[in-house]
C-alpha cells in the first residue's frame, strides 16, 4: 500500500510517525508534501515543518516536497509516485480536483464531523466546553471538510486539557483510527455528512487572545485553548499565565484582587473568579503573580487591569 502523506505541524507528525513505524509492512510512505519552511521567533529564523524534521532527523528515504501550490508540475509528481492513497492531516492547502482524481484522498480531521469544519477544531472543542472529544476520517471532496465520513472515534472528557495535551491525545487516537481506515477501506460504509448540522471554525489570530474579567469560565477555557499561541492577555498586553478556574457563580467587581498568596492571585470576575499563578508584562520575563503585584503596589481590593 503506497501512501503519499500531506501534513505539516506536530499533530501531523504523530500520524506520519505511526504510518512509517507501523509493523504492517504493507504500508509504505512514498512521499511527504508539506508547507514551506517559515520564519519563526523574534529572529525570524527559518523553521521546517515538524513532519519534514521527523524525516530528516531519522534519515528516512522518503522524498520531501514543499510546493507553493498543487498545480503542474506537482500534479504529475504525485501521479509518478503512484499512490494507493493520499493521506491529508493538517496540511494547510486545499486539494484541487486534479489531485483528488489521482487516488482516494483520506483526511484525518480533529473533530466529530460535521462539527467544527475548518482550521481550528481542537481550539473550538475547548472553547465550547465540550464533554466529548473526537476525531474522524473522511473521504475528501472539493468542499472544505464536507466529504463522506469513513470512521470516527471519541472519548468522554474526564478532566480539562490544554491545547497541547488534547492535541497529543487526539493525534494518537487519530493514528490508530487512520490505520484502521486504511486497512478496512474497501469494506467501510461511507456516511454522508448532514450539512445542516455543520459548524465552522476559523484560523486563530493574535487578537483571539484578548480577554477581560467578565466571565471566569470563558477566561479559563481561553487560557487552555490558547496556551501555546497567542496566549491570553489583557487590554494593556499583560499576559495571564497558568490560570485556574476557582468558581463560576459569585459576582465580583471586574478584575478585583480578592486574595494574594504564594499560589498566585485570586481575581474576581463579573461571574466567577480565577487564580493566576504568573503574570508577564510586555518585554519582561514572567513573574510569580505575588511578585508582579508587589512591584506594582497592588493589594487586595485593587483592580488588575
Give the residues covered by each predicted segment:
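N-terminal Rossmann-like dinucleotide-binding module
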Residues: 1-42
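A residue-level signal for conserved active-site and pocket-lining positions in enzyme catalytic cores
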Residues: 7, 32, 55, 86, ...
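Active-site-proximal loop/hinge segments within enzyme catalytic domains
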Residues: 10, 142-246
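Conserved beta-strand segments of alpha/beta enzyme cores
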Residues: 28, 61-63, 104, 239
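Conserved beta-strand termini and adjacent loop/short-helix elements that scaffold enzyme active sites
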Residues: 35, 65-67, 140, 152, ...
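N-terminal beta-loop-helix "entrance" segment that forms/cooperates
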Residues: 38-57
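Alpha-helical oligomerization interface recognition
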Residues: 68-136, 140
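Internal anion-binding site segments
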Residues: 195-305
